[in-house]
Amino acid sequence: MDKSIKREHVLREIHELLASNGFETSHIYERSCFDLMARRKLLLLLLKVLVNIDGINSLQAHEIRTLAHTFLASPIIVGVRSKTEPLKEDVVYERHGIPAVAPETFRNMVADGEYPEIIADRGGYYVHIDGKTLREVREEYNLSLKDLADLAHVSRKTIYKYENGLARASAETAMILEEILNIRITLSIDIFSVPDRDEIEIKPSGRLADIGFGMIETHKTPFDAVAKEIKFDNTVITNLEKERDSRTLRRMAVPLKDLSLVSGSESVFIIDNPRINENIEGIPVIKSWEIGEMESSREFLKVIAERKTCS
């Protein structure tokens, strides 16, 4: 792909690709830590599109991973090149814990269901070996660990590690093993996975904490925070008043509604101004003092449901 390619062009192509392959897509949010959200059945994607995948920093990546875990979404970077070379097709790269692939690789996954097998890492390109298949076929050929190791020009210990899932193989070694055994032994990489929760901070936050919600504050998103129901795991995208005027709140309601529809989450404004109606452009409004009178997260969600249709 030409180095002069514009990010906007790649982003538009990815958006069109998703829409034409059965995904419900959000608007594009270029000033956010993520560019768009897309859903197809149970698969929810949180995408960042870059020309140079090294352009993402650790803080942006952390926020993307946090949101992905909260929404049970798969974070992914689609990029054209790194700072040193173009991204290769059907190879998975990684930046700050987020998988990164070339547009062609992403297209293969979305349109054709073909997933990459090769991982780019320090020192070269690697694959995951199907250890069970490797052991079964080796034994069918009556080959010992040492026999197969000698044929593949690796150590007996290396073959043992492959069979027990203790090591990745270089792409070259995997190819040699497949030629020897006449069978595919490499595994496709599932990059549509949800990040682990061990690094995610869900902070108790005032009145919401009292009724069973944790709050995840965001810094570079089209919304202010995400409230996570601790007991039942429901998610609510939240905008706070922050002394914003009615016109600004109406403008902010558009991405709130858009993202809540795609993510399957609830959305709400939490504000102090008593003059604001109970609904802004289809988004329910709850006053801060009302939360103090609620007894549970269920009551909070019930009020949201009731106020969706308020005029």
Curated annotation (Swiss-Prot):
Residues 145-164 bind DNA. One of its GO terms (molecular function) is DNA binding. PROSITE patterns: HTH_CROC1. The keyword Transcription applies. HAMAP family: HTH_type_cro_C1. It comes from the Archaea. Residues 134-192 form the HTH cro/C1-type domain. Keywords: DNA-binding, Transcription, Transcription regulation. It comes from Methanothermobacter thermautotrophicus (strain ATCC 29096 / DSM 1053 / JCM 10044 / NBRC 100330 / Delta H) (Methanobacterium thermoautotrophicum). This is Putative HTH-type transcriptional regulatory protein MTH_967. Pfam families: HTH_3. InterPro entries: Arc_TR_HTH, Cro/C1-type_HTH, Lambda_DNA-bd_dom_sf.
